[in-house]
């Protein structure tokens, strides 16, 4: 709730329209108890009310809606004030044909108060583990700022429920030959309390990377 209005106001809608994009802003609400839904609706956003709990469940529901609507490209960013929506055009400019692009915080403008040393070290270790296990280069595994072509989303095979979703998107790209590009981005201190728990969620992400090395395809997409 705290960052939504500011983030919406900074989306470069006019610049995107001038480039030929027809835009829509979609908010996936994971059962929030604050004013997120009412603020989103007042701003003119489309709201998806998430079924089930967890970031992964919400993202997969958003992907499904995207494919039903029939749009061509999708930009995803966490709505916590850490990512700069002004940089959406930079991601779209670098989007490979039939691929995805990941905003790279670790080689971009990472503000000094934006990430704890524990999270920075954990992200580096998880990113190293991802490449060691799956071979495809990636520089910021846990980034929450991605852009996707429609073809890439159609090919992703996912069943993650929580914060391991980005890791599974990466492994699916690695095993299905989906092109990945990387763009350095700005990363600022978040608004509000973080939901990502360093140890618990880091362990879940590592487990997902290992499982997808042994079983590249989910047994069941929930």
Annotate the PLM regions.
Residues 2-6, 34-43:
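Acidic helix N-cap motif at the loop->helix transition within catalytic regions
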Residues 48-66, 73, 85-163, 189-200, ...:
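Acceptor/aglycone-binding surface of glycosyltransferases and processive sugar-polymer synthases
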Residues 136-137, 158-161, 171-187:
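Catalytic donor-sugar/metal-binding loop of nucleotide-sugar-dependent glycosyltransferases
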Residues 11, 62, 80, 149, ...:
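Residue-level signature of catalytic and energy-coupling elements of molecular machines
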Residues 29-37, 81:
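A conserved acidic beta->alpha catalytic loop
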Residues 1-16:
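Short, well-formed alpha-helical segments that are part of the catalytic scaffolds
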Residues 12-26, 35, 45:
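Short loop->beta transition adjacent to catalytic acidic/histidine clusters or analogous donor-positioning motifs
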Residues 70-82:
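Short beta-strand-to-loop acidic/aromatic patch adjacent to the donor-nucleotide binding site
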């Amino acid at each position: 709730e705290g960052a939504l209005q500011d983030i919406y106001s900074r989306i470069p809608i006019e610049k995107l329209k001038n480039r030929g994009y027809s835009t829509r802003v979609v908010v996936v609400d994971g059962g929030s108890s604050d004013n997120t839904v009412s603020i989103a609706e007042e701003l003119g956003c489309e709201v998806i009310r998430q079924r089930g709990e967890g970031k992964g469940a919400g993202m997969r529901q958003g992907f499904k809606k995207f494919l039903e609507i029939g749009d061509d490209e999708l930009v995803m960013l966490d709505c916590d004030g850490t990512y700069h929506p002004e940089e959406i055009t930079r991601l779209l400019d670098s989007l490979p044909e039939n691929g995805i692009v990941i905003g790279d915080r670790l080689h971009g403008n990472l503000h000094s108060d934006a990430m704890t040393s524990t999270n920075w070290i954990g992200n580096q270790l998880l990113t190293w583990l991802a490449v060691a296990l799956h071979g495809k280069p990636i520089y910021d595994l846990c980034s929450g700022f991605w852009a996707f072509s429609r073809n890439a989303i159609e090919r992703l095979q996912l069943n993650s429920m929580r914060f391991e979703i980005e890791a599974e998107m990466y492994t699916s790209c690695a095993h299905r030959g989906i092109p990945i590009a990387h763009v350095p981005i700005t990363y600022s201190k978040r608004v509000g309390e973080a939901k990502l728990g360093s140890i618990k969620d880091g362990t879940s992400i590592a487990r997902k990377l290992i499982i997808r090395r042994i079983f590249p395809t989910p047994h069941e997409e929930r």
